[in-house]
């Protein structure tokens, strides 16, 4: 089976082979050449075959997926040109809208513990020393079973580690006060960018993205118009999502069709400024995640935006026009041309620069996993409405989504912040009790005389306020420790939880 996406001038239809869709792909081209339409058409094709999809909407123009398109203008011309079936070709799709900020979609959250120290270090833009300290903080939290759900948990954990630095030194290493301060300042910057919304509960359950409706895969659209203004937060979230899928999904080998497909727009942001250790791990995840039935499609202007180790794994390629005005542009054109299997009838280097809007150089993997010779083709028009729906329509669609009721409200569950505060309260009360005992001891005979006169408490006699506080805090801390220290937390390839 193929997901038909394009047609040549010789009426040859081209598409992605279903069993090769998890071999990943690339959609590249200059601004305004048709990348978003290609992305949309691919997402529709996967959905039609019951494959759930995740895609990023960085321009806010993909909400029209919920409505059928209209037989007018260029859409009507292309439908007739390619004999696609007229009005019956058009269709709306099952869509769930998501938004980290909770403004135009279902609130989308993860937790600090789930993101892990490696991706969080990138998010906070930490240097190697500061990253080392953050790893130490996570290790202490993991060993003690303290959950880091939101930013206040991380702040509390940093404070706890700093205040107890000497006790951790032998087992975990030195705790630099300067690094603690630097991380705290980075957290302030992150909060100013709106990251408070990203971390919390209920956190995303990936099963909610692996859904179908009436036999078609649900298209999960992440509104990123605002998120894209914080590139590190944008890239860290997408990398976390990739890692979560890799860790949570079972091995399926080579399925007849993918289990899930992701489209990462502005894909260069995943790698801009990333340390080599992170790039290496991303390359490893991309290589291994296909055995989980997941296909990843990178969308970017220039193929050179991606590391060679990642680019080499993208088997299904759609290359829209590139403009070759500068030496770097010319290098990009040549590089893009070299990634295609040659076709004696096409000069790829010359063709890339003169492709029209909606035209592309296309090469997909065949049944044996071999790239087909490059062809010049026209991308089929989307079945859904190209224009976005209104804000009112979108708001109504979001509230009608079955998942909205579960995710809409932030829940502040008990975690490291509460546990550490309770421990601090208990320590303060214990210190006060010690001081009182010392005072009684210093009182000497007067203390003994008091006990002789008034005696000790009888069974059932009411506790003092201080004794009640100590008892209550001790019980609360005990409950938290028993409930949280159930097993040592295990982390996977990008630092994400292994649940």
What does each of the following model-derived ranges do?
Residues 43-53, 60-284, 310, 353-355, ...:
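P-loop NTPase motor domains
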Residues 41-43, 66-87, 284-368:
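Conserved ATP-driven motor cores of ASCE-family P-loop NTPases powering translocation/secretion/packaging/pilus
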Residues 445-453, 462-493, 497:
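Membrane-active amphipathic alpha-helices enriched in small hydrophobic residues
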Residues 12, 20-25, 51, 216-220:
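Pre-Walker A (Motif I) flank of P-loop NTPase domains
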Residues 27, 31, 274, 303:
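The conserved Walker
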Residues 10, 107-113, 124, 351-466:
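Conserved P-loop NTPase motor module
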Residues 35:
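Conserved lysine of the Walker
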Residues 1-14:
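N-terminal pre-Walker A segment at the start of P-loop NTPase domains
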């Amino acid at each position: 089976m193929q997901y038909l996406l394009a047609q040549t001038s010789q009426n040859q239809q081209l598409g992605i082979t279903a069993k090769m869709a998890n071999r990943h792909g690339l959609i590249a081209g200059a601004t305004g050449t048709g990348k978003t339409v290609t992305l949309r058409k691919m997402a529709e094709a996967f959905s039609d075959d019951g494959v759930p999809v995740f895609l990023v909407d960085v321009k806010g123009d993909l909400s029209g997926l919920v409505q059928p398109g209209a037989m007018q203008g260029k859409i009507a011309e292309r439908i007739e040109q390619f004999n696609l079936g007229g009005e019956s070709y058009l269709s709306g799709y099952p869509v769930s809208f998501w938004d980290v900020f909770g403004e135009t979609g279902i609130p989308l959250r993860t937790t600090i513990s789930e993101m892990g120290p490696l991706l969080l270090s990138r998010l906070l833009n930490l240097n190697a020393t500061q990253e080392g300290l953050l790893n130490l903080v996570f290790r202490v939290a993991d060993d003690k079973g303290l959950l880091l759900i939101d930013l206040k948990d991380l702040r509390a954990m940093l404070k706890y580690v700093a205040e107890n630095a000497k006790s951790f030194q032998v087992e975990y290493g030195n705790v630099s006060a300067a690094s603690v301060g630097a991380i705290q300042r980075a957290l302030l910057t992150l909060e100013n960018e709106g990251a408070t919304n990203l971390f919390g509960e209920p956190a995303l359950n990936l099963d909610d993205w692996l859904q179908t409706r009436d036999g078609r895969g649900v298209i999960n659209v992440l509104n990123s118009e605002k998120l894209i203004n914080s590139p590190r937060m944008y890239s860290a979230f997408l990398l976390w999502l990739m890692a979560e899928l890799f860790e949570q999904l079972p091995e399926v080998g080579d399925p007849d069709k993918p289990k899930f497909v992701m489209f990462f727009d502005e894909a260069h942001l995943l790698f801009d400024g990333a340390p080599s250790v992170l790039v290496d791990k991303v390359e490893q995840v991309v290589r291994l995640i296909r055995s989980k039935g997941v296909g990843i499609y990178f969308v970017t202007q220039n193929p050179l935006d991606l590391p060679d180790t990642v680019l080499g794994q993208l088997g299904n390629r759609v290359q829209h026009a590139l403009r070759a005005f500068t030496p770097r542009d010319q290098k990009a054109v040549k590089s893009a041309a070299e990634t295609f299997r040659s076709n004696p009838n096409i000069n790829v280097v010359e063709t890339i620069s003169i492709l029209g809007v909606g035209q592309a150089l296309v090469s997909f993997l065949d049944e044996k996993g071999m790239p087909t010779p490059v062809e010049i083709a026209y991308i089929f028009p989307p079945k859904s409405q190209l224009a976005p729906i209104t804000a009112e329509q979108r708001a109504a669609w979001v509230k009608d989504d079955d998942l909205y009721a579960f995710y809409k409200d932030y829940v502040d569950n008990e975690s490291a912040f509460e546990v550490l505060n309770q421990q601090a309260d208990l320590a303060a009360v214990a210190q006060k009790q010690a001081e009182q005992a010392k005072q009684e001891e210093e009182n000497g005979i007067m203390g003994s005389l008091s006990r002789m006169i008034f005696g000790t408490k009888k069974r059932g006699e009411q506790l003092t306020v201080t004794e009640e506080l100590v008892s209550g805090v001790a019980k609360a801390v005990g409950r938290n420790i028993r409930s949280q220290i159930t097993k040592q937390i295990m982390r996977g390839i990008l630092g994400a939880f292994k649940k």
